[in-house]
Amino acid sequence: NIKFSEKLRTLFIGEDSGNHVSNFVWAYELDTGRLQRLLSAPAGAECTGLQGVDDLNGWTYILSGFQHAGDYTSATVQAVKDAAGPAITTNYKGLMKGAAIGYISGKSVAVRLTK
């Protein structure tokens, strides 16, 4: 999942990987080569629906969701499952059943990842 913002000169990357416990949304600034993590999905979840709005009445929005919280891989150690499982069950109505959407917002100058 990727989205490019021409105004911010930034590539936003939403992970869907089984290579680690938590997936993230990243921002890669083309002009500086700087990579920053913006948000983390719950253990086992994938980041989905990545969107960006460069200018909506002077504000910039980065939108993302996640799904399949608790969808662990065979490499996920039991200690992680034991630690994350109760929170996922409580907050997202059970393993692999919950999802959420959200956004990060700010004025376009405030959303710049470097000065």
Describe the role of every protein-language-model region.
Residues 1-115:
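Sequence/structural signature of beta-propeller domains
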